[in-house]
Amino acid sequence: GLVIGILIFVKMINGKATRNCNIMDTVYGEKNMAISSLSFSNGATSGSEELQPLCYYYIKSAYNCCSGGNYRNDYVSLCSLQDLLKQGVRGLDFEIYSINDEPVVATSTVDNYCVKETFNYIKFSDVINTIVNTAFSDNVPNPNDPIIFHLRIKSENKTMYKNFSQMLQSISNRLMGPDYSYEYKDDQGRIRNFGEVNISKMMGKIVIVVDRSNTTCLCDDCEEDCGEFYEFVNMTSNSTFMQLLRYSDIEYTQTPDDLINQNRRAMTIGVPNKGANPNNPSAAVMRSLGVQMLAMRYQMVDANVEENDMFFNEDGHAFALKPLNLRPIVTVIDDPVVQNPALSYATRTVEGAFYKLDV
């Protein structure tokens, strides 16, 4: 009886990956025709509604985008990623681990670089191949839009980072290029706000965002150990210009006005709370506070996911402009009135029959 029970359990576990894929294919397998790529007319100017900085947009995003089930005792798969791309999702969050000195995708519920809690993993090289071959093809509704990688790297293995950089080098034509390297540093080595870069510069490109809570290889002088990994990083989260917030920190913030004002020019990625099977955040609440990257758990089909999908479908794009009241407040001052020279405070000469004064 014990042997039979073990065999049944193993069969159930092995079938879980297939069931996850079947569910994702059923719900998300058809291309979402309500979404299309952003487009810009040749006559558009920097002040038009057509051309705006990245931080002005809500971005359709997925948390742990290769997960088709729970974050513990479950599976990750490329089928989940492929189905989300068909729905127009362009913000892709990954949890990265090091196995055999290679970057791999898995999930976990513990903050431990040595523990992954999925039964399997996906090589990040396979993720890159899927993105390059699918995300910019006619298999998705918005192939010209940017892809934003949000990488939460759970490793300090510098050899893995070096191998990671070689993978990124192999698709350098799809990345943002040297003008946006090293966290978009200027000529003096100062980190700039990548969120202020116009989204038109990113069309058809992959943007690399790395969680700065792990600073391994996020350094200018570590190429010997880390390869060129930092060169490919356009922005970091958990940093000055981009927050990484769990939903509870957004929903119960004590200073909502501060969060709104920060998100006028800086950025925030909002993600579900911790746990093996957390609830979806309310994208409506996150949008009301100006949060840009709305990272949902698409494998949990609930009212919050449906509301979020409806919002982007009605907008028609995976990058939806935030309302004016959540963007930077621009104060326009009228031209000053031309002054009467006779009323000037400039020194003038006053004289009479018996005096001459400069006043």
PLM region descriptions:
Residues 1-91, 98-359:
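Long, acidic (Asp/Glu-rich), low-complexity accessory segments flanking structured domains
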